[in-house]
Amino acid sequence: MQGKSVSIGAAGSGVYFNALDVLDAAGLSISDINPQYQSFEDSKESMKDGKIDAAFVVAGAPTTAITELATTNGVNLINIDGDLRDKILEDCPYYKAKTIPAGTYKGQDQDVDTITVEATVIVDKDESEDTVYKLTAAIFDHADEIAKENAKGEELSIDKASDIQGVPYHAGAAKYYAEHGVTVNTDES
């Protein structure tokens, strides 16, 4: 990517910080590329028009922007694997290894190894235990209904609830998880 025009997300966005992590692990910095600070939609249009060479996209697969590009222009997904992925996972524990299965996008004939970040609901630590318990229950008790509206809902899993590290879980969420046999870190634990 050195010297290439690359969309790294809007300045200060999650995509921007994820791009910095990947560049750093690859031994690159923003000064090594021609950074473009664009949304997914703008990145998609810039790729279509040949204005950029690459774009960081931090979204669940399949995502609309890539699906559209794969259909209209064709795309090449870049593996984040081997030593690069190992370094990212070691330096940044909030990432997980992920494989995008072959056939997810038109023209993608092979699996693509990459990294992922988990979506997280954050609440104020002073929010009532009852409110947070009810919010957590609303999400997990209705995961099948969420999945009907959005395929990413199929990834909601009580078993993955304890995967997030470094930030304590609210007592209301911890209560719900405990009722379902999952122990999570709280300020009290």
Residue ranges and their predicted role:
Residues 1-49, 163, 167-172:
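Bilobed "Venus flytrap"/periplasmic-binding protein-like clamshell domains
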Residues 11-21, 94-165:
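Ligand-binding clefts/hinges and TM-proximal coupling segments of bilobed small-molecule sensing domains
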Residues 42, 49, 59-77, 84-94, ...:
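An extracytoplasmic/periplasmic, membrane-proximal ligand-sensing/linker region
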